[in-house]
């Protein structure tokens, strides 16, 4: 069973989520794994669909929400690795990012997973930024 999303195409069920691998999204050059979380048996939830629509229409605002946490990941990395470019402000990170995945619950509850061009090739880590109640106060490093 599949659900056809108007932007993402065919989504497959995974537990209670609806997912797509390597989706082309209108707001980023990367092909992205996307999960619209906590759906029903036949389709993603209305709140997850609305959340994805909001993210797609407001990607610059999403970047603003997560950029301070991204900079907190960047600073110790830049201090430890001499080849990492030196950025003075959080907004300078954009353009060095690759969107890996999105997990969307609603307009103000979602996670964004990124990898950055300046990360060393031997570094397997991806960084997930958590937006909860419209605020990003945490991130985690996976890999």
Identify the residue ranges that each predicted region occupies.
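Long, contiguous N-terminal structural blocks used for assembly/anchoring
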Residues: 1-84
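Acidic, proline/glycine-rich low-complexity IDRs
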Residues: 1-25, 89-143
